[in-house]
Amino acid sequence: MRTQWVELGERSYPIYIGDGVLDQGVLAEHLVADRALLVSNETVAPLYAERLAVPGAEVQSVTLHDGERYKTLQTCEQVYDALIEGRFDRSATVIALGGGVVGDMAGFCAATYQRGVGYIQVPTTLLAQVDSSVGGKTGVNHPRGKNMIGAFHQPRAVVADTGVLATLPEREYNAGLAEVVKYGLIRDPAFFDWLEAHVDALRRRDPEALAHAVAESCRNKAEVVAADEREAGERALLNLGHTFGHAIETYTDYCTWLHGEAVAAGMVMAARMSVRLGWLQRNGLERTIALLEAFGLPTRPPAIPEARFRELMSVDKKNRGGQLRLVLLRSVGDAVVTGEFAPEALTDTLVEAV
């Protein structure tokens, strides 16, 4: 088992990473009281819920529908109902067992129930293990934009059992690899090199390679969050491809494209725009496309009219004073958040996508 700490002073917490960590009793160390509510979905709960039993603790459960389209305030009411009907007080712990949708919603409910209770993330998808479970971003979607309603609320711990990824459907596994690639693109060129050299091992889910990829991704995420918890600066770099990607997800009603797939196409759009601006060498774009395609990911968005694409991007949370701000690349391993770019570079990128 590897342990990576997210250093936030008194609110620091560990990320436990490795095959079989669900069975190593780490959950019990982070329960404040002997009662917890397990929040999961209809896909994951039958597979892993029993492994989260804590000796001497009462763990109640609520099971939600699976899928991004259910990441809503209405779904959260099921969690609030379970907390209230179960008479949970502020000493309660919410345990999020599932992918990013479950983790985001359970974390948001924990942040808002009685003005805040503790929670533990137990991510069961690659995307959740390397990204959404770490950093305290919680929230739900709104019909007009992704993650528009939410709160920063750090977990007490993250338990990332890489063994559960062995049975993850290939499409979901590949979607998680998009977020892994992102860390290499924004700040870790050596990790990007390593990914290029270990495509085959990661595609076949070699346990050692997978544990390393998750650990390095979590290390990068933890370092960024420790330096900029509230996304005032560096943390916004973690959104490479997300402004384009969120527009894709919203346009397709959160039904057709997985989050990681949309991010993959969005990262390529950001790279193409960076080349147009003269910031990124064409070789950097070609390496990005080649690696994402090697991981079975889309590198072009669906056909979205330029005006509609712009409209969807205009509600992005990185924007300031009505100005669109994007994460762009200067090289592989070097990214920048900026609203200062030639407008035609964006126009040409959107038009090319259509």
Curated annotation (Swiss-Prot):
Top-tier EC class: lyase
Gene3D superfamilies according to UniProt: 3.40.50.1970, Dehydroquinate synthase-like - alpha domain
Enzyme Commission number, as recorded: 4.2.3.4
Pathway(s) where this gene product acts: Metabolic intermediate biosynthesis; chorismate biosynthesis; chorismate from D-erythrose 4-phosphate and phosphoenolpyruvate: step 2/7
Binding site for Zn(2+): E179, H242, H259
Keywords of this entry: Amino-acid biosynthesis, Aromatic amino acid biosynthesis, Cobalt, Cytoplasm, Lyase, Metal-binding, NAD, Nucleotide-binding, Zinc
Cofactor(s) for this UniProt protein: Co(2+); Zn(2+); NAD(+)
Gene Ontology terms: biological process: amino acid biosynthetic process; aromatic amino acid family biosynthetic process; chorismate biosynthetic process
GO MF terms, alphabetically ordered: 3-dehydroquinate synthase activity; metal ion binding; nucleotide binding
Catalyzed chemical reaction(s): 7-phospho-2-dehydro-3-deoxy-D-arabino-heptonate = 3-dehydroquinate + phosphate
Positions that bind NAD(+): 66-71, 100-104, 124-125, 137, 146
Main location, first listed in the record: cytoplasm
Domain of life: Bacteria
A GO term from the CC aspect: cytoplasm
Classification via InterPro entries: Dehydroquinate_synthase, DHQ_synth_AroB, DHQ_synth_fam, DHQS/DOIS_N, DHQS_C
Cell compartment(s), UniProt: Cytoplasm
Cofactor note: Binds 1 divalent metal cation per subunit. Can use either Co(2+) or Zn(2+).
Task of the protein: Catalyzes the conversion of 3-deoxy-D-arabino-heptulosonate 7-phosphate (DAHP) to dehydroquinate (DHQ).
The family this protein is said to belong to: Belongs to the sugar phosphate cyclases superfamily. Dehydroquinate synthase family.
PANTHER family: 3-DEHYDROQUINATE SYNTHASE, 3-DEHYDROQUINATE SYNTHASE, CHLOROPLASTIC
Name of the protein: 3-dehydroquinate synthase
Source organism of the structure: Halorhodospira halophila (strain DSM 244 / SL1) (Ectothiorhodospira halophila (strain DSM 244 / SL1))
